[in-house]
């Protein structure tokens, strides 16, 4: 996902609240009706009707039984979408009622025939309706019904936060990705192309000359990342040889009149992939390829089919978010959404309360890309510039099990946190080994923030626990207070959690590392100290305050 800048009409996908409903728990937790079964594969078929803004479809969910609970199966499908029929292993359910729903008609509880632990089964659900329309995608989610510049239908979906159940029935929780991937079949008119995640498996011609485009995803994938794009697309093909020597197919599906622009702008892809593979390890989805798809919205990290809508220009819609000058030297949407292939798609948080793992590390990929192309000084200036976007309005980590995101500061406060960890490690090779090992150790897995925090602490040999608490779980920015008395500099932390232990680099005429605490400590600056200079390295996101 990307946060919202310079756009008066946009809002964050989820809003923090103090009280939660039963529906928040049904959406955000692993309920008993979810816990007894594990998703193995999704087979999604959808036929959209542009004229009526409606869809009909079928979803087949292959699942494994984890426990013989005797409980119903919770399936999520958001109102006003409606279930028509349900089959288990090819047998239609004839019970009346076959299911019940909650008061919002977003959550269905389906009676099952009863299954043995360890067995694998299929549920097929036929459904139809007019899905929620996205009024301001991607921040306001739903189905997108637009027309291109030549007045031709152009359709897609953006549903992170809102949930994939806005348009197809599923277990709508990040913790349960289909272990064996998914298939997405999309019907489109004869003069339109339907693009999906993964690789094109087949194209089926119908009597009315429409086509069903069948896309196969071999890797685990987040529900919200499975997305169709339907438009007047042409394909640009290329390939990339990664650091392991493997060949990665590159495919760019763009509106026909933008082909030449895309060919030029997407020359940035290979240098970007070189940089990200160097810092994060091999691209995580070689089997499914790398795609950019022109979208009727700004952009999203749809796995192996990244939504691109930045107008073939550098920066964020032509703006440098950092105001450093470096943010206009590369395409923000291309870089940010591609960075999510490692953090967000390869490594996925089980609860959206921990989404900083997606957004903080991915936002730091922007700094790393700047470093790869223009050097460390440029990267530091970009990183420091994006602090302008930090609000410190609420904690980055939110409430668990109620489908609640934390502050939008998860992006650039999160990025600054990662950068400070790098400074404290003070060894770029070691830091790189950690970012690469994260993607290797948690390859295609769902995680919690605490697991990521523990991993970094163990691999670095540095106890960052209080630093994580400070920047992720409070809104307070550490303040380094200091007093100068001739050649003596007294210093301490205030506005911090107990036992806060951020080690920082300062300049008193010479570079010095300090390990402040909440108690006053003394630095002897030396006989040649002029009693004036005391600066904190700008790579640390803290406040400095002199006491007199």
Give short role names for the model-derived ranges.
Residues 10-56, 84, 93, 146-153, ...:
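N-terminal, polar/Ser/Thr-rich
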Residues 17, 30-31, 117, 126-182, ...:
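Glycine/proline-rich low-complexity spacer/linker segments in large multi-domain proteins
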Residues 57, 160, 171-335:
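Hydrophobic helix-coil surface modules that form long, contiguous segments used
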Residues 70-95, 187, 191, 505-513:
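Solvent-exposed beta-hairpin/edge-strand motifs
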Residues 78-146, 208-211, 524-528:
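A surface-exposed beta-strand-loop module
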Residues 82-88, 195, 464-465, 480, ...:
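Beta-strand-rich binding/interaction modules
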Residues 218, 355, 359-420, 442:
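Acidic/His/Gly-enriched intrinsically disordered linker/tail segments
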Residues 284, 407-489:
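Amphipathic alpha-helical substructures
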């Amino acid at each position: 996902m990307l946060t919202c800048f310079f756009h008066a009409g946009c809002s964050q996908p989820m809003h923090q609240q103090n009280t939660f409903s039963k529906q928040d728990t049904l959406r955000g937790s692993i309920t008993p009706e979810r816990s007894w079964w594990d998703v193995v594969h999704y087979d999604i078929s959808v036929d959209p009707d542009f004229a009526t803004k409606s869809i009909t479809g079928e979803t087949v969910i292959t699942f494994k039984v984890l426990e013989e609970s005797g409980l119903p199966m919770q399936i999520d499908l958001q109102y006003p979408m409606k279930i028509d029929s349900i089959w288990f292993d090819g047998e239609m359910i004839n019970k009346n009622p076959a299911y019940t729903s909650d008061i919002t008609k977003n959550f269905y509880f389906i009676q099952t025939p009863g299954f043995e632990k360890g067995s694998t089964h299929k549920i097929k659900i036929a459904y139809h309706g007019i899905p929620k329309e996205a009024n301001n995608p991607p921040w306001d989610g739903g189905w997108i019904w637009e027309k291109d510049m030549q007045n031709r239908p152009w359709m897609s979906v953006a549903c992170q936060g809102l949930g994939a159940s806005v348009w197809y029935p599923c277990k709508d929780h990040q913790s349960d990705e289909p272990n064996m991937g998914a298939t997405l079949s999309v019907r489109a008119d004869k003069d339109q192309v339907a693009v999906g995640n993964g690789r094109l498996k087949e194209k089926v011609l119908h009597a009315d000359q429409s086509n069903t485009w069948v896309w196969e995803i071999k890797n685990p994938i987040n529900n919200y990342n499975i997305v169709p794009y339907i438009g007047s697309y042409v394909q640009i093909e290329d390939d990339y040889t990664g650091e392991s020597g493997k060949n990665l197919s590159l495919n760019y599906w763009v509106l026909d009149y933008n082909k030449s622009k895309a060919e030029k702008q997407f020359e940035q892809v290979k240098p970007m992939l070189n940089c990200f593979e160097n810092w994060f390890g091999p691209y995580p989805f070689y089997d499914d390829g790398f795609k950019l798809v022109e979208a009727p919205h700004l952009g999203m990290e749809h796995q192996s089919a990244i939504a691109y809508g930045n107008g073939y220009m550098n920066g964020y819609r032509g703006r440098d978010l950092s105001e450093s000058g470096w943010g206009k030297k590369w395409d923000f949407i291309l870089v940010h959404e591609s960075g999510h292939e490692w953090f967000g798609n390869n490594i996925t948080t089980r609860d959206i309360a921990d989404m900083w793992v997606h957004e903080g590390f991915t936002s730091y990929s922007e700094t790393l890309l700047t470093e790869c192309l223009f050097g460390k000084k440029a990267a530091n200036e970009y990183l420091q510039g994006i602090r302008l976007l930090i609000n410190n309005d609420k904690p980055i980590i939110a409430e668990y099990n109620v489908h609640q995101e934390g502050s939008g500061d998860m992006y650039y406060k999160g990025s600054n946190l990662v950068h400070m960890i790098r400074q404290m490690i003070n060894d770029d090779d070691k830091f790189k080994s950690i970012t690469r090992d994260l993607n290797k150790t948690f390859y295609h897995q769902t995680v919690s923030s605490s697991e990521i925090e523990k991993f970094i602490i163990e691999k670095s040999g540095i106890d960052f626990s209080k630093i994580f608490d400070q920047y992720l779980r409070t809104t307070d920015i550490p303040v380094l207070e200091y007093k100068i008395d001739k050649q003596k500099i007294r210093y301490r932390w205030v506005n911090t959690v107990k036992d806060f232990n951020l080690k920082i680099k300062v300049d008193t005429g010479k570079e010095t590392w300090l390990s402040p605490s909440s108690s006053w400590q003394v630095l002897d600056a030396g006989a040649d100290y002029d009693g004036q200079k005391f600066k904190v390295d700008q790579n640390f996101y803290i406040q400095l305050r002199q006491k007199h």
